[in-house]
UniProtKB/Swiss-Prot annotation:
Native source species: Pseudomonas putida (Arthrobacter siderocapsulatus)
Protein name: DNA-directed RNA polymerase subunit beta'
Pfam families listed in its UniProt record: RNA_pol_Rpb1_1, RNA_pol_Rpb1_2, RNA_pol_Rpb1_3, RNA_pol_Rpb1_4, RNA_pol_Rpb1_5
Binding site for Zn(2+) 2: 814, 888, 895, 898
Reactions that this protein is recorded to catalyse: RNA(n) + a ribonucleoside 5'-triphosphate = RNA(n+1) + diphosphate
Length: 1398
């Protein structure tokens, strides 16, 4: 018995380890794992069903079939444990040892491992410096390779075909050694002297100029250094021994009819063994060379599919016409080992059922059907029954439970008391998709769910199912109760707003009870307190909507935390007074003294949470729900067809529109307008008509006439059921009502273009057949889009989680003072997101001063909460530098100060919070709501007129930013720089900025006062002017009629215009010699120079420019000498929605990206080539001029002689994030990506906190590229981790030349694959490539992320698991002297491997 206990003890032991290393296995190592050689291809005997000896399932090698019983049955039972039977050679042991025992096959000749041969770049090829094609010719016995040239003229590694080989034999005899096949490759690999090769390579790299060569050399150098560093021997890439996986991994299942379902691996192994045995026999018989040469490549071709089927061209197909599943396929993909078995497993103790509403539950409860509870908690019930002495054995307990005796139900009730269960609804898109509840036993078979948690599960009751899981261990129950309980998750982790907001019926009920009605029963009465109102209402003496006065006592919490009580009389309604009874103390009466629409209720709950705390809020939310349900029941709101009131004006509006359309049609018929103009006009018309109808309809619905107390007829807000539903936010919207009672309007075709004929009917009137048919387009497209969208969104989430999974808060403060500059987010002069919202929950990086003084009002290191936000807005501060995850300098993970507030909890983030995964979920979860379409700008969808002036929103002082301007003779200023802004500062010094284009005429001087609404700048939106900065005389250069220019005379006005011809329209002979330009000269005809430079004032004219001055004309400063027409109406597709978000996170370079200035300096144009212009920037600091060739069709925003700053736009287009990072730095990149992604989400009305996007961005920026290697061991172009590079820099000694590096932006997929952890990368994508690389370079995985730890089956180093890991490390450090360090072990291992290899 003692033995047995020891045995069980030994089984449960966990080996403690800190890292996993992957490497190449030497033949000796493979033999040491093996328990015997597999010699026969047979699996089991078809008659006896016993494994064949020496076969693939051989019991002698892999262990017994039954526990503790040998094959022939001589030894049975536990007492013979460890005995090896002399008859059948099987060891008596547990049957499951077969899962870990391996066999091997001794190969008759060496074979190249397909991963190291074919997985690009071919590792074998790199080491031998041969191409893959050449190596294959050797392997497949097409060519000889020279292994040792001896004293001959041949070279090592040279290929010889048969003829050449025999010639060489005749010429040199035995002086040289050449061979073919994998053996030859192995010899060559064995002969490589790494020490000898590395030195010359290191010296050669700095001397090479060609980029491609450097790349190739550094790849080779890296590979050699890796081999040298870890004791992998190159020749191990050629296999001489093949391991055989244990039998249970290739199981046999008997089917009817005496056949077996077998794993594909067995087929693949069988082919290898057959061919290997045949080859062995041939070698033993010393068969002719030609036969052997035929057999060896066949063996190579048998081993390749076993390791990776399909990697070498055509996959081998099994009997079921499908490719066989090889060893590599076992671990790849969604069905592979990593994703199927290691990262996610199916769990026991779980059930699922349909959900139904539980309106009587409390927020922390769920209704669990008794049947399910009985099944789920069975072991607990058995235990309790035995403990109580109601059952003597487990078997008896089982009987009791099956008979469902009354005692069992009592025990069950006791077992589930305070034992939370997890409820989960698929798809679990964010962490709120799994939550803990306390079960309440109910009859019936459906799980009951609290209505307020539906929002986070995205659940409805139309047949959704949910799963229940039981946390078993005490620790798990504690975590469920403390962390995952639904009552502890009131705020959304994505944006910090409450997520238990009532919806639908509840909102309707609350809205109904807080509306007011004119002349309701009891209007004008005055009440002493809320209780009196309640009594009178119940007695039926006052109506719910009656306007009354009531005296209230309210307690209000002040900002400093003190409580003030006051008593006042308020004008209110009966319903609002009743509602105030459930509001917790500490909130003022004003929060309910309004019609409670959905937004107001959300605000109320948020305020409640901030003022009175979690517990009160939960109770309040429940009370709100009960009240809402009660009053929506009483209200009797329903929908009848008469609620859809069709406005009387509809017929007139549609009639007018139809007439106008006819008019346009006749114009088109007589050729006055083009097809395109007609289409646009018609669509504009119908859009307008549609708006008018819906306005009329809403006006009609929203008001009703009633008689007041004086008997006069007055208007009040309508009590129309449908209007109330839409207005309260309970359901429906103006757009939906428009389709029911207005007109359906214009429909789009599946390709996004709009159909000219609108649907003038609505659903109440009914649609005609044609109208119905037109509308089916849209409906179908919607469904198809949704299906595609879900898959894409899920994949985006998966990539995000993968890139951010190892980001955990690991320390309080990293000590950096870097941060992002936060300003209000402004679009077109409107504040979309005020500064307060953006800095809420962030830590201030540098002191904030009071505007215009040196007083610090917010010190650095402050965590900004709601009170600080008020304070910042009061002091009208317009920018704050806050800490950001992008700038955090923590080596592994991130620090709490850079992250700031934990959005779901409302306080500074705890150490151990997995902020990376939370960020990924917050961005990915709303992904399904984003659209998939790319929008066509054009048509009626969004045609906005081009802006042509700046109108000031708020008055103030004018000031210009980054603006070059010249003063015209009439006193107006003209902007002559690209990225200038006009800033209007209000009395607090807060600035509102307006962008000004080149050539804008500005009517406000520096420091001048401006009134609100004044127009301060104007420009022509359709042309791009060229403005002179000088006074002088115009001379034309290179302008010859009909060669470079053509004159056009306008017939109506009689004015002549000069238009510059496009290059391709000019005569071929003089196409490139003449460059039309306008030159400025003074009265004497001498060249004038641009102000402040020695560049002659010469303006080169691009194609299609219109010149508005005559040769020899006198012009003044700021005059327009030429205009370039802008094509405003060009429709460019802008990618919207999900694809846009994915593009940004993948850091893809957009097509025709904008061109930015690489250096600050003066613009000039050099010699043109055929299709390109040469742009030259002469830097202001006097360094080498920078040249760039730009295609001629690109429209340039700069002119000769203009000053530009580094990073300014030279040619418009979508921005390339790489350029922004390189030229403007990390902060600018952060701002750009933040704003772009937020724009997409904002359009859908989704709120996501900026810091989630920054968190992902930090992971995309985690690598740096070495630009100068200095004295370090790096090579130019290497990539390494950013925090590590900083440390490397800091730790370099004084005299060492430190390596220089630049930050690199990687897309999320690239970043995931280049993590330090190979386990995480391999379980993500491209498993083969990742593992090959890791094995060759002998990578170590230090198991720092979450994924790696899940794979090896440990607690994750986040949350409660972080404490466990910290404690484990501490314990280990305490035991240090007793243990050997990992590096010592590795050294010993390497030595052992080397000696075994040699």
């Amino acid at each position: 018995m003692k033995d047995l206990l020891n045995l069980l003890k030994n089984q449960g032991q966990v080996e403690e380890f800190d890292a996993i290393r992957i490497g190449l296995a030497s033949p000796e190592m493979i033999r040491s794992w093996s328990f015997g050689e597999v010699k026969k291809p047979e699996t089991i005997n078809y008659r006896t069903f016993k494994p064949e000896r020496d076969g693939l399932f051989c019991a002698k090698i892999f262990g017994p079939v039954k526990d503790y019983e040998c094959l022939c049955g001589k030894y049975k039972r536990l007492k013979h444990r460890g005995v090896i039977c002399e008859k059948c050679g099987v060891e008596v042991a547990l049957g499951k040892v077969a899962a870990e025992r391996m066999g091997h096959i001794e190969l008759a000749c060496g074979l190249a491992h397909i991963w190291f041969l074919k997985s690009l770049p071919s590792r074998i090829g790199l080491l031998m410096d041969m191409t893959l094609r050449d190596i294959e010719r050797v392997l497949y016995f097409e060519s000889y390779v020279v292994i040792d040239p001896g004293m001959t003229t041949l070279e090592k590694g040279q290929l010889l075909n048969d003829e050449q080989y025999f010639e060489a034999l005749e010429e040199f005899g035995d002086d040289f050694d050449a061979a073919m096949g994998a053996e030859a490759v192995r010899e060559l690999l064995h002969a490589i002297d790494l020490e000898h090769e590395i030195g010359p390579l290191r010296e050669e790299i700095p001397q090479t100029n060609s980029e491609t060569k450097i790349k190739k050399l550094s790849k080779r150098l890296k590979l050699m250094e890796a081999f040298q560093g870890i004791g992998n021997l190159p020749e191990w890439m050629v296999l001489t021994v093949l391991p055989v996986v244990p039998a249970p991994l290739g199981p046999l299942v008997p089917l009817d009819g005496g056949r077996f379902a077998t794993s594909d691996l067995n087929d693949l192994y069988r082919r290898v063994i057959n061919r290997n045995n045949r080859l062995k026999r041939q070698l033993d018989l010393s068969a002719p060379d030609i036969i052997v040469r035929n057999e060896k490549p066949m063996l190579q071709e048998a081993v390749e599919p076993l390791l990776d089927n399909g990697a070498c061209g055509v996959a081998i197909i099994g009997s079921n016409k499908r490719p066989l599943k090889s060893l590599a396929d076992m671990i790849k993909g969604k069905q592979g080992l990593f994703r199927q078995n290691l990262l996610g497993k199916r769990v026991d103790y779980s059930g699922r059922s349909v959900i139904s509403v539980g309106p009587t539950l409390r927020l922390h409860q769920c209704g669990l059907p008794k049947k399910m509870a009985l099944e789920l908690f069975k072991p607990f019930i058995f235990g309790k029954l035995e403990m109580r002495g109601l059952a003597t054995t487990i078997k008896a307990a089982k009987k009791m439970v099956e008979r469902e005796l009354p005692e069992v139900w009592d025990v069950l009730a006791e077992v589930i008391r305070e034992h939370p269960v997890l409820l989960n609804r698929a798809p679990t898109l964010h962490r709120l998709g799994i939550q803990a509840f306390e079960p309440v036993l109910i009859e019936g078979k459906a799980i009951q769910l609290h209505p307020l948690v539906c929002a986070r599960y995205n659940a409805d009751f139309d047949g959704d199912q949910m799963a229940v899981d039981v946390p078993l261990t005490l620790e798990a129950q504690l975590e469920n109760g403390a962390l995952m309980m639904s009552t502890n998750n009131i705020l959304s982790p994505a944006n910090g707003e409450p997520i238990i907001v009532p919806s639908q019926d509840v909102v309707l009920g609350l809205y109904y009870m807080t509306r007011e009605a004119i002349n309701a029963k009891g209007e004008g009465r005055v009440f002493a307190d809320l209780q009196e109102v309640d009594r009178v209402f119940r007695a039926g003496e006052a109506a719910l909507h009656a306007k009354i006065k009531v005296r209230i006592n309210e307690t209000v919490k002040e900002r400093d935390g003190s409580v003030v009580k006051n008593t006042r009389i308020v004008d209110t309604t009966v319903g609002r007074a009743l509602l105030f009874q459930v509001v917790p103390g500490g909130l003022p009466y004003d929060v309910v003294n309004q019609p409670m629409k959905k937004k107001a209720i959300s605000k109320l709950i948020n305020q409640c949470y901030r003022v009175v705390g979690l517990k009160e809020t939960v109770i309040f939310a429940d009370q709100l729900m009960y009240t809402g349900f009660a009053y929506s029941t009483i209200s009797g709101v329903s929908i009848g067809v008469n609620d859809f009131v069709i406005p009387d004006e509809k017929a007139r509006i549609i009639g007018n529109a139809t007439d106008e359309v006819k008019e346009i049609e006749s114009q088109y018929a007589s050729g006055l307008v083009t097809q395109g103009e007609k289409y646009n006009k018609v669509i504009d018309l119908w859009s307008k008509a549609n708006d008018e109808v819906s306005k009329a309809m809403m006006a009609n619905l929203s008001k009703e006439k009633v008689i007041d107390r004086e008997g006069k007829e007055v208007e009040q807000e309508s009590f129309n059921s449908m209007y109330m539903m839409a207005d309260s936010g309970a359901g429906g919207s103006a757009a939906q009502i428009r389709q029911l009672a207005g007109m359906r309007g214009l429909m789009a075709k599946p390709d996004g273009s709009i159909i000219e004929t609108p649907i003038t009917a609505n659903f109440r009137e009914g649609l005609s057949v044609l109208q119905y048919f037109i509308s089916t387009h849209g409906a179908r497209k919607g469904l198809a889009d949704t299906a595609l969208k879900t898959a894409n969104s899920g994949y985006l989430t998966r990539r995000l989680v993968d890139v951010a999974q190892d980001l955990v808060v690991t320390e309080i403060d990293c000590g950096t003072d870097q941060g992002l500059v936060m300003t209000p987010h402004i679009e077109g002069g409107d504040v979309v997101e005020p500064l307060g919202e953006r800095v809420l929950g962030r830590v201030i990086a540098r002191d904030v001063f009071k505007p215009g003084t040196e007083d610090v009002i917010v010190p650095a290191g402050t965590l900004v909460d709601e009170q600080w936000v008020e304070f910042i807005e009061l002091n009208s501060i317009d920018e704050v530098i806050v800490r950001s995850p992008i700038n955090c300098e923590t080596r592994y993970g991130i620090c709490a100060k850079c992250y700031g507030r934990d959005l779901a909890r409302g306080h500074q983030v705890n150490i151990g919070e997995a902020v990376g995964v939370i960020a990924a979920q917050s961005i990915g979860e709303p992904g399904t709501q984003l659209t998939m379409r790319t929008f066509h700008i054009g048509g009626a969808a969004s045609r906005t007129s081009a802006a042509d002036s700046v109108q000031v929103k708020n008055g103030g002082m004018g000031a210009s930013r980054n603006l070059k301007q010249v003063e015209r003779a009439d006193g107006n200023l003209v902007a002559v720089s690209r990225s200038g802004e006009l800033a209007i500062a209000d009395e607090f010094g807060r600035e509102c900025e307006y962008k000004l284009p080149y050539g804008a005429v500005i009517s406000v001087k520096e420091g001048e006062k401006v009134e609100a609404g004044a127009i301060v700048a104007k420009w022509d939106p359709h042309t791009h002017p060229i403005v002179t900065e000088l006074k002088g005389t115009v001379t034309f250069v290179g302008m010859e009629e009909n060669i470079t220019i053509k004159r056009q005379t306008d017939e109506l006005t009689g004015l002549t215009n000069i238009e510059v011809l496009d290059v391709k329209d000019r005569p071929a002979a003089r196409r490139h010699t003449l460059r039309p330009a306008i030159k400025m000269v003074d009265a004497a005809g001498k060249d004038l120079y641009l102000p402040g430079t020695d560049v002659p004032a010469q303006y080169f004219l691009p194609a299609n420019a219109l010149v508005g001055v005559a040769d020899g004309a006198q012009i003044g400063v700021g005059d327009v000498i030429a205009r370039i027409p802008q094509e405003t109406s060009k429709t460019r597709d802008i990618t919207g929605g999900l694809p846009r978000v994915a593009d940004l996170f993948e850091a893809r370079r957009p097509k025709e990206a904008s061109i930015l200035a690489e250096v600050s300096g003066t613009i000039a144009f050099g010699k043109e080539t055929k299709g390109k212009r040469r742009l030259v920037i002469t830097p202001t600091d006097g360094s080498e001029p920078y040249e760039e060739l730009i295609p001629k069709w690109r429209h340039l925003n700069v002119f000769e002689g203009e000053q530009v700053n580094r990073g300014e736009v030279i040619s418009d287009g979508p921005s390339d994030p790489d350029d922004i990072l390189r030229l403007l730095g990390v902060s600018a990149l952060g701002k750009y990506i933040d704003n772009e992604i937020q724009d997409v989400y904002r359009l859908q009305g989704v709120k996501i906190n900026d810091k989630h996007i920054e968190t992902i961005l930090r992971q995309m920026l985690r690598k740096v590229r070495i630009s100068e290697s200095g004295d370090s061991s790096f090579i130019k172009g290497d990539q390494m981790e950013y925090p590590g590079a900083g440390r490397e820099r800091a730790s370099a000694s004084e005299d060492k030349f430190i390596s220089k590096f630049t930050r690199v932006l990687l897309g999320i997929t690239k970043a995931s694959l280049s993590t330090e952890s190979f386990i995480s990368a391999a379980s993500f994508q491209e498993t083969t490539r990742v593992l090959t690389e890791a094995a060759v370079t002998g990578k170590r995985d230090y198991l720092r992320g979450l994924k790696e730890n899940v794979v090896v089956g440990r607690l994750i180093p986040a949350g409660t698991g972080l404490a466990y890991h910290t404690e484990r490390m501490a314990r280990r450090d305490a035991d240090k002297p007793l243990r050997v360090s990992a590096s010592e072990v590795e050294a010993a291992l390497t030595e052992a491997l080397n000696s075994s290899g040699n």
